[in-house]
Amino acid sequence: MARYVYKFGGTSVADARRLYAAARKLAAAQRQGNEVIGVLSARAGQTDALLALAREVDPDCSGRELDALLSTGEQCSIALCAMALR
C-alpha cells in the first residue's frame, strides 16, 4: 500500500465546487487501496480576513491567541472536506 499526501491550497478549497473536487481526489486515491493524507489550507482570503479582524480588536495582536484564531481557517476547510467525503 502506498502513502499519498495531498496538499490543497486556499484556492483549491475556496468554494463548494472546488472542495468537492479535492474530496473526490482524496476518495479516489483511497479507493485504489492507498493510505491518503489530506492537508488543507484555509479558504482563499480567509486568513487575511481573520488577521484584519484580529488587528481591529488588538492592533498589536500576536502570539498564542492569534495562532489559535488563524488556525480556525484550516479547521473550517477540514470540517467542510470531511462533510464532502461523507
Go through each PLM region and give its residues:
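Nucleotide/pyrophosphate-binding catalytic subdomain
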Residues: M1-R86
